Amino acid sequence: SALNPVFDRRVCVSRELLERGIAVDYLDLVAHDADLETEAYLAGLPVRSIVAADASREPFWELGERRTVDVGRYDVILQRKDPPVDDLFVRHHRHFIAAPESILQINRPPATYELSEHTIGMRYPEFSAPTVVCSSFEELVAAVRDQDGEAVCKPKNTYCGIGVSFVPSDAEEHVLRAYWNQWAPEVIVQAYLPAIEDSGDLRILTLGDQVLGSVLRVPADGSRLANLHQGATAARLEPTPRQLACCAEVSADLNPLGLHLLGLDFIGEHLTEVNFTSPTTLVQINQVNGIRADRVMVDQLERMRAG
């Protein structure tokens, strides 16, 4: 499988697990049949052992021969899926609802595909940026017009900043119509937060009740997109007490749903998104803070597994 250890936590976490003598297997869903009956699907996972993992050289990891195992042999399953949440992901992931409750799944379906990362912040109005989900062109126009000067429009099911647009609140209707035609049937409108220009976008990564670390994403010159895939750079910034209070509230709410590993995004003091299908930046957290957040993550996994 192709890996990019600049963004992908799998290499550093696998290395830490192997250094502790913990066996790690890798399941590539492309090699499995999503249309199997659930019992057969879970009893016949085509996995390969991860023999070695090292982000400093290629290949970044070494895999053993493929073999078939039953899901019940595992203590922890770490799921990772680059957005968007598509039909193939759901068809695979729904099978894991039936996995034994004794297995710690990071993160567990069906919440992984029933909830939206872009809108889940609306559950926490005390902390979140003002957000409207528009399911018609008329709603989009009204939401944009309601903003003070500028609105942030984003598709509901994209990633890496794809489709994010900064729109004047008095934009002509043909501009909004073109955006709607491209990204319908649902578009999210958020208030524009000027803090993005001064202080970027802070990602705080949590696992259970443990904060793994944080990293500030600073937009490139001339850009307002604070996404590392869109040219932003990583920098160090400590979370504020209010941001940490938000993390605690969100974790306490979502952990019981099976969403344990979370990437919370803040512009200033406002929560803008909560990532749970593929929350990255563990590598950048290590780099800018000079820590080993992967070790903290594995420590927390062991505590959570022990109950």
Where are the regions a protein language model picked out?
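Phosphate-binding site of ATP-dependent enzymes
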Residues: F137-E138, Q147-E150, N157-C246, V250
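Residue-level detector of anion-binding/catalytic polar loops
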Residues: A23, L104, E150, Q210, ...
